[in-house]
Amino acid sequence: MISFIVIGRNEGQYLDSCFKSIRKAIYENNLIDSEIIYVDSNSTDNSIDIAIKNEIDKIYRLTEIWNAAIGRNIGAINARGDDLFFIDGDMELVSNFIPLVIDDNGNLKYDLVSGNLFQIFYNKHGRIQEEKLEFRERQNSYKKPITGGSFFIKKEIYKNIGGMDNRFWCSEDPELGLRLAKKGVLLQYLPATFIKHHTDVLKNPKVTDLKKGGWLYGNILMYKLNLFNKFTYKRMLFSDSSLIVLIFCIICFFWGLKWIMILYPITLLIRIKFKISKSGFQKYIYLLCRDILVAIMFIPFYKKPIPTANIKYQIIK
């Protein structure tokens, strides 16, 4: 049995399409033994009404504290299925992906699996500005130590790893991926579209990122909790190489090798591929500010996860 777990907060604009896409996948693939669970993060719009109208099997509303990690964990705890599928309320499931991951008996073929995303970007007027595949260059199947926000996973594996760490209000999915990878469970990526994602276009994503502090808090905590995980360093080399160089330079500075500090700005220049344009300069400043803040904020202690028993939620259905 598979449990489809939908999470959302104020996603009424897209939620009906999300539910209908899951219903379509269930019908077209004859997944009779399945259920749909919706966990709402105390929405102020009509999300709950939409879930009720769509006759969702189980509906829960988080009432005091909420984030994506908490929502997914509550859904998993209340799921009857041996296999779980997580999807956000602003996404749609592509029905023809199901036969690639579910066998004739309705069981998940892989321990952890996902596919490509078809991104649909909307401007401030609500009109589609751009549509594209997230990973156009990835044409082959492979394994990687990351999950993303939507994926299929065996419930036993999700339970044994402790689910998502609810301290994270962002970056909860890559952190889960690192812990799973350390246990030998890598995500199987299939080069087929499995999700349509509706999202807004950000005018200045780098500036917004720094202002909200989402990347800073999530990634710092992720790196700190997984400091002795070899997959952490592989991720850092791929996405945060300048941060590694900065840390190395700081260590050398205190050893008296001050001249090595020149390596850091050179690394930044390499990362932006020597662009002399305005966008290149903005990225240079962004990376500089981000890396310095990460290095500083790595030291503080962070609160412990909230015990599941202390999380309050209302059972709507």
Map each language-model feature to its residues:
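Catalytic core of nucleotide-sugar-dependent glycosyltransferases
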Residues: 193, 205-231, 288-302
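A conserved acidic beta->alpha catalytic loop
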Residues: 21, 38-48, 91
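Short, well-formed alpha-helical segments that are part of the catalytic scaffolds
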Residues: 11-26
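Conserved donor NDP-sugar-binding/catalytic core segment of glycosyltransferases
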Residues: 96-127
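Glycine-rich, basic loop-to-helix element that forms the pyrophosphate-binding segment
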Residues: 62-79
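Short aromatic/hydrophobic "clamp" motif used to bind/position activated sugar donors
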Residues: 84
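Acidic donor-binding loop at a coil-to-helix junction in glycosyltransferase catalytic cores
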Residues: 170-178
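Membrane-embedded multi-pass helical conduit in multi-pass membrane proteins
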Residues: 244-306
